[in-house]
Amino acid sequence: MIRHFTSTVFVVFKNKIALHWHEKVRMWLPPGGHVDLNEDPIQTALRECKEEMGIDISIFSEHKYKFEDTNLQNINPPQTILIEKVEDNKIGPHEHIDFIYFGYPKDPNFKLLSNWIWVDSKDLMNEVKFKNPELKYFAPPNDVKVLGMDALVKLKNLSN
């Protein structure tokens, strides 16, 4: 089975998460993408937010280790790691090993690209359907609902 490493970030601001309509997989998703050669998963998360959303973010982590050894650098762990089954017409069936992070904008006066929507906890809990570019309505998938709710709880006081 072919496997790719990916990173996804649930970006929280003012008690909402940012989602966009992903044309390829046809779902409302947070920013994310494949880990590039010589990139660690956090670098991927930061890059994808800049490329897809046009903003710089900070990664939230509950784990902070400090080492005095200059040969060691700590990379904070993700909130979770998902194995996601993917169907692709070019590659065929494969899996994504997806590092899931929570983050928030570095600059509270950021300008978000127009293809993004802000979704709050009520929207997630009630499985509200949002209009995509084809004027059809879809709710975010269950994993986005569950992880989005967790991100909103954990970052409640950091993103206002």
Show which residues each predicted segment covers.
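Nudix hydrolase/Nudix homology domain
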Residues: R26-W28, G92-N160
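Active-site segment of metal-dependent pyrophosphate-handling enzymes
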Residues: G54-D107
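Conserved Nudix-box catalytic region and its N-terminal flanking loop in Nudix hydrolases
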Residues: K16-F67
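Conserved N-terminal beta-strand and adjoining loop/helix that marks the start
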Residues: M1-I17, H34-L37
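Residues within alpha-helical segments
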Residues: F10, L46, K50, M149-L152
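Histidine-centered active-site/metal-ligand motif
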Residues: H4, H22, H34, H94-H96
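Residue-level signal for short segments within beta-strands and strand-turn junctions
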Residues: V11-F13, W21, Y104-P105
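Generic hydrophobic secondary-structure packing signal
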Residues: F5, P41, V144-L147
